[in-house]
């Protein structure tokens, strides 16, 4: 269970059982184990190495090309290192596969991870490599003098992001990318319904406008767009939605020690409210309906909450839109922070 202050928003590269590290991968049921890894005095360029890297790419061909080009450039600098890339479309699948492979000692050398996943990996014996000594090594660490590329120094890494890669006083990952959530809005639809997009969205406003947008005419078509499809409000991550709502209500979700607090009266009230809007057709989620951007861009959605990392998919002029140009509708896009209770 993720503590809500993590909010699944930051990603990092974790070094899981690096090449040359001892790899006794039996589960320890709650104990925090460290891999027996020591920084070598020098890098042996005569020895061949293979590194397995598990990454996420959202089925984005441009992102895939960046991964491949980066690996190609890296292998040109280090011809004795081969990087084997495996791409996933879901962070949870990487997490599950790492856990599954701990028992068979087939974890990747490097993987993209949420910081809170590392705590689970550490329950295995000698699975995750602590990076403190490697990061500080003057030759091969951050900004190291013997590196074949221009590496950032530790001082050049945003300290707040680096801190999220620390657990029990040790660094187990390096920051890789960062995003948050935003609400992408069809401003034309909001105004067509007689409303004005406020600077700060509230849940009451979202629900009221969404219910208005869900109304159908006598011909059983949606009044707002004259079509057969309209999902006024779509939230990409229901995990994040619940975390946001409970945090805003100062209600329990979980503690840093893993204590579950989500089963409370506030959660019950929130879920009943959401269920009402699902029944009326005013609300849906990615897992039920698909990507919010596809509906927003086609004029079939008013409010779409998604990651800022996906901004290039949102709106009629989105360069990475997954729908055809013929299906896109022209409208003014407004962007706001996620809805608030106050």
Where are these regions (language model features)?
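Glycine-centered hinge/linker elements that transmit conformational signals in sensory
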Residues: 209-211, 256-287, 338
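Conserved N-terminal structural module of periplasmic/extracytoplasmic solute-binding proteins
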Residues: 4-10, 21-127, 144-147, 151
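Hinge/lid segment of periplasmic solute-binding proteins
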Residues: 38-39, 43, 116-180, 327-339
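Short, solvent-exposed loop/beta-turn-alpha elements that line the ligand-binding surface or hinge
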Residues: 132-156, 199, 224, 249-269, ...
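Short helix-initiation/N-cap motifs at beta->coil->alpha
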Residues: 87-97, 203-207, 285-297
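Paired acidic/hydrophobic, glycine-rich loop segments that form the ligand-binding mouth/hinge
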Residues: 109-112, 302-306
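Extracytoplasmic/periplasmic solute-binding protein
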Residues: 163-176, 181, 205-260, 303
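Extracytoplasmic/periplasmic substrate-recognition and gating elements
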Residues: 47-49, 76, 82-84, 104, ...
């Amino acid at each position: 269970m993720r503590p809500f202050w993590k909010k699944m928003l930051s990603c990092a590269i974790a070094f899981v059982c690096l090449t040359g590290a001892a790899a006794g991968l039996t589960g320890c049921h709650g104990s925090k184990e460290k891999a027996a890894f020591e920084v070598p005095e020098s890098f042996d360029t005569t020895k061949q190495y293979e590194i397995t890297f598990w990454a996420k790419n959202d089925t984005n061909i441009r992102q895939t090309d960046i991964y491949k080009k980066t690996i190609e450039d890296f292998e040109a600098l280090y011809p004795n290192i081969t990087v084997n890339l495996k791409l996933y479309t879901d962070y949870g699948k990487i997490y599950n596969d790492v856990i599954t492979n701990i028992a068979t000692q087939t974890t990747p050398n490097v993987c993209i991870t949420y910081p809170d996943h590392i705590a689970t990996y550490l329950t295995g014996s000698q699975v995750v490599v602590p990076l403190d000594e490697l990061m500080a090594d003057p030759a091969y660490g951050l900004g190291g003098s013997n590196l074949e590329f221009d590496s950032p120094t530790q001082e050049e890494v945003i300290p707040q992001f680096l801190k999220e890669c620390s657990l029990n006083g040790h660094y187990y990952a390096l920051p890789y990318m960062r995003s948050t959530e935003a609400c992408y809005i069809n401003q034309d639809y909001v105004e067509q319904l007689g409303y004005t997009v406020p600077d700060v969205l509230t849940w009451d406003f979202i629900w009221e406008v969404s219910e208005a947008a869900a109304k159908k005419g006598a011909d059983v078509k949606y009044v707002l767009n004259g079509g057969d499809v309209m999902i006024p409000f779509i939230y990409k991550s229901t995990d994040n939605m619940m975390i946001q709502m409970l945090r805003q209500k100062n209600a329990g979700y979980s503690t840093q020690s893993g204590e579950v607090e989500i089963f409370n009266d506030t959660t019950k009230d929130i879920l009943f409210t959401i269920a009402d809007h699902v029944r009326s057709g005013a609300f849906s989620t990615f897992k039920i309906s698909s990507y919010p951007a596809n509906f927003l861009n086609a004029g079939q959605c008013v409010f779409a909450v998604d990651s800022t990392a996906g901004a290039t998919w949102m709106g009629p002029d989105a360069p990475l839109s997954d729908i055809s140009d013929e299906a896109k509708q022209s409208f003014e896009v407004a962007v706001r922070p996620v809805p608030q209770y106050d």
